Amino acid sequence: MSTDARANHRIKSIEIDEESLAAASRDQEQERQVAIFDLLEGNYFEPAEAGDGPYDVRLSLIENRLAFDIASAGHARRHLLSLSPFRGVIKDYFLICDSYYSAIRNSSPQQIEALDMGRRGLHNEGSNLLRERLEGKVKTDLDTARRLFTLICALHWRG
């Protein structure tokens, strides 16, 4: 894909519905802000049948489903994804993140590294699942899916 075509298929703005957003710890809020910054700095996001972007994206929860509202010039579309396939990986991700944040303050570098490897593995699992669930609706690269997965988790954090 050419650089110009790739530049047109990107998210230019991302919004998380405040009503859907769960309370977050300071660490979680920082992780969310970093994910938003990194996502907007570089991403690949190509909705099916949407034409050229860039795109404005809004994430929210609607009746226990994840809503992706995607808009660009002359295009607006909502994709709803069931949260059921994500529940296990999100639950495990939260558990290991809690352990990781605690370890940063109290554990050896080896323990922190082991938890970080587990955290990254679960993050990759969630990101790959997101790409699978979006198949036929939206194409993304792995880095974009990873950042979106972080933001999806933000909708579930229960401070």
Curated annotation (Swiss-Prot):
NCBIfam families: PRK02853.1
Family according to the record: Belongs to the UPF0262 family.
Source organism superkingdom: Bacteria
Name of protein: UPF0262 protein CCNA_02430
Database matches in Pfam families: UPF0262
